[in-house]
Regions:
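Acidic (Asp/Glu)-rich catalytic clusters
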Residues: 23-30, 48-71, 88-104, 141-146, ...
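A short beta-strand-loop structural module common to alpha/beta enzyme folds
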Residues: 32-45
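Gly/Pro-rich active-site loop or hairpin
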Residues: 45-51, 84, 123-133, 192-261, ...
Length: 308
């Protein structure tokens, strides 16, 4: 008897272009689950609430009632060493949101982006040390207390050197080992591999697959440095471009074959959805992800022997 296939869903984007692009997928019944940037209303504003459009709130409520809603934090700054008032307020608002709607689990980004009064929206890695692991476990406990549901982390795309990529899997495993959830982003794995000249498959195989409950699949873009000696293009996990299928889908297939606790696969894309051609490319990428999942779990369907 095969494994239960995961849900396949979308990350909700706060843009009208997303609503137009994704509507045919919802209408066709292809979206099993919804993930939302759970702190989108208040994360960047130091606690000031910026309410969502009504159509978004209604959509969140529908998926929460179906027990198919997932939360993803952006602005907490998980590994900032000194918890500040903004983060304490963030935790209070997370608790309020998780009391309002039921989430299957809530994840945050690995790394840090806040120092004192500065909020930097580029996440930075942290050296893998015992102190950093203890800090991560403490922050994970704070998330769990606020969310009152399973919580976890997403692997980071940025790296300042090879060790940030090669040690990340063990680093995450040490933090999450007690009770945490790993959100495995395969585009992030490929991004680190490309930028550092490392084999993506080898990086992927280091992750603790038994902790993976969610997978992210996305696209991104390339940045061309202008004022550095090294003029190589840098891959960014910016979600603003089509999915590089030839590179990312094989990594997805590898992960699908190994993640026994996998619950959901989410496709992410934001921006550049203004034309019908861009919207159709978005839908085609989602269908490609869904097809990859269906293919990987084809053996889960009852076969002739089961029917007999």
């Amino acid at each position: 008897m095969g494994r239960t296939p995961p849900r396949v869903g979308l990350n909700l984007i706060d843009e009208e272009a997303f609503r137009v692009a994704a509507l045919p997928l919802f209408e066709a019944g292809l979206v099993d689950a919804l993930e939302v940037d759970i702190d989108n209303e208040w994360g960047a504003s130091r606690g000031r609430i910026d309410p969502r459009p009504a159509w978004q709130s209604e959509l969140l409520d529908v998926f929460a009632e179906e027990d198919a809603l997932y939360g993803h934090g952006v602005w907490f700054s998980f590994l900032t060493a000194r918890l500040d008032d903004r983060q304490r307020r963030w935790l209070e608002l997370l608790a309020e949101e998780c009391g309002r709607r039921r989430y299957r689990h809530v994840t945050e980004h690995f790394g840090w982006m806040t120092s004192g009064p500065f909020i930097q929206n580029t996440l930075f890695p942290m050296p893998y040390t015992r102190g950093a692991v203890e800090l991560g476990r403490d922050r994970l406990a704070l998330l769990a207390a606020a969310a009152r549901c399973p919580v976890g982390l997403e692997n980071l795309a940025t790296a300042l050197g090879p060790a940030d990529a090669t040690e990340q899997a063990a680093f995450l495993a040490d933090i999450l080992a007690p009770s945490g959830v790993l959100l495995l982003d395969v585009h992030n794995v490929w991004t680190q591999a490309v930028n550092l000249g490392l084999p993506a498959e080898q990086l992927l195989l280091g992750f603790p697959f038994h902790l993976v409950r969610e997978i992210h699949v996305s696209g991104g873009s390339w940045f061309q440095p202008e004022h550095t000696a090294d003029r190589r293009a840098v891959r960014m996990d910016s979600h603003d471009g089509a999915m590089p299928r030839g590179e990312v889908l094989p990594l997805l297939a590898m992960a699908l074959a190994r993640c026994d606790q996998l619950e959901v696969v989410i496709y992410e894309r934001r921006g550049l959805l203004g034309t019908e051609a861009e919207r159709e490319a978005y839908r085609a990428d989602f269908r490609a992800v869904r097809a990859a999942v269906d293919q990987a779990f084809a053996s889960a369907a009852p076969g002739v022997e089961d029917a007999a």
